[in-house]
C-alpha cells in the first residue's frame, strides 16, 4: 500500500525555493557540468538505504519519492517535476544512506551533479 505523508526531514522545497540561490546560474551549472541520465518509467534514480552523493536537475519527466517504514508500508513523501532539483537532501548533507527512494513515474531525463561540484558553486 502507498500512503501520503508530510516528510518534514525532506527539505527540497526549501532548496528549490531558496532566495539566496541564483537558480538560473545553478541550472546552467547542472546542464554544463552534470551527467545526463535517462531513466525509463519505473526505474530508480536512488533506492532507500543506498549511498548517494548526487543532486539531480530534472529536464523532463516526473519522479516520486517514497519511504518504506519499519512495518513495510510505502509512504509517498514527495514529487519532483521538470525544472525541479531532486535528491534525498538529508542523507546527502549528512552523508548517510538514503532515507527515500526516488523512482521515475514517467520516462525522465535528469542531469546529475556530485555534491562536491555543487559545493564549489
Question: Which stretches of residues belong to each language-model region?
Answer:
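Short beta-strand segments in beta-sandwich/barrel cores
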Residues: 35, 44, 62-67, 85, ...
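Glycine- and acidic-residue-biased ligand/ion/polar-headgroup-sensing regions
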Residues: 53, 57-64, 83
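Cyclic nucleotide-binding regulatory module and flanking cytosolic helices
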Residues: 3-41, 90-91
Amino acid at each position: 500500500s502507498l500512503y501520503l505523508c508530510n516528510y518534514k526531514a525532506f527539505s527540497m522545497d526549501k532548496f528549490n525555493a531558496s532566495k539566496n540561490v541564483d537558480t538560473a546560474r545553478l541550472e546552467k551549472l547542472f546542464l554544463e557540468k552534470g551527467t545526463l541520465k535517462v531513466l525509463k518509467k519505473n526505474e530508480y534514480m536512488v533506492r532507500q538505504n543506498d549511498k548517494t552523493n548526487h543532486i539531480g536537475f530534472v529536464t523532463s519527466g516526473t519522479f516520486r519519492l517514497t519511504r518504506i517504514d519499519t512495518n513495510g508500508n510505502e509512504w509517498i513523501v514527495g514529487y519532483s517535476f521538470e525544472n525541479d532539483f531532486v535528491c534525498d537532501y538529508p542523507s546527502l548533507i549528512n552523508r548517510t544512506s538514503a532515507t527515500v527512494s526516488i523512482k521515475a513515474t514517467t520516462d525522465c531525463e535528469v542531469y546529475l551533479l556530485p555534491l562536491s561540484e555543487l559545493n564549489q558553486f
